[in-house]
């Protein structure tokens, strides 16, 4: 049975790392990249542990097996997460509803990933709805960025209600900054 929960064990962090590595852009064939989507950032166990100390991430399990994750990334994680710090720097002045994002109380989605055998089964929505349940009382917005080449992820985020607010290019990719408004 599928159920969403917060990360609570070291084993779950290890399972997140394993799923992350299996779905990295550089680990997939061009066909898989196009059809299945991908993740761009590599997460070490140490980095996951530090992020978890700030705020637990959300996972979906099928009985005891972790089949999806959505990493909670508070802005403070930018102090030890280089890629996240770059993202935060790039989006601080992005405007949302006439105000800079920096004027909102928001946190970031560090990454979302679902085991390929479980895609299309509602896990994406389950992960994000659990984020909303846990964090919407403390935050106005959930912000993330998605590779413009990751069409599957862009469609899934739009379907849930995320709105693209800004597009930029860095040394890695072209990124769409998307916002889920909980106000």
Regions found by a protein language model. Name each.
Residues 45-59, 75-82, 108:
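A short helix-loop-beta-strand connector motif used in the catalytic cores of GNAT acetyltransferases and
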Residues 1-22, 26-27:
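Conserved N-terminal entry element of GNAT/NAT acetyltransferase domains
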Residues 169-183:
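C-terminal "cap" of GNAT-fold acetyltransferases
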Residues 114, 120-133, 159:
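Conserved acetyl-CoA-binding loop-helix of GNAT-fold acetyltransferases
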Residues 125, 148-166:
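Conserved active-site alpha-helix within GNAT-family acetyltransferase domains
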Residues 105-109, 135-147:
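Conserved GNAT acetyl-CoA-binding A-motif
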Residues 25-45:
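Conserved GNAT-fold acetyl-CoA-binding loop/helix
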Residues 71-111:
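Conserved acyl-donor/pantetheine-binding loop and adjacent beta-alpha core of acyl/acetyltransferases
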